[in-house]
Amino acid sequence: IRHPKIVLAQAILETGWFRSPLCRNRHNLFGLTNPKTGKYYEFNHWTESVRAYYTKVQYKYKGGNYLLWLHKIGYAEDPRYIREIIRVLKHLGKS
């Protein structure tokens, strides 16, 4: 995984600090959906979710500012998503 701290911040934000039902019941850390059905993927273990993030999202990344790249590809619908990722990163930096 490239930019693991940012990816961790994404997982934290997407799952509400790993408390969401999607995380707990389906082991989906990133809100990944099947583009054909629009349904959330279900994984047997959280590590499968990380692998899926790499193969379905990060494989497109060719370098540069990762946060800007996430914004450019429209990773999240929330227009404040990148600001929220930065907020989580700052929080993690204080830990």
Regions found by a protein language model. Name each.
Residues 1-95:
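Catalytic cores of secreted/periplasmic lytic hydrolases that degrade extracellular macromolecules
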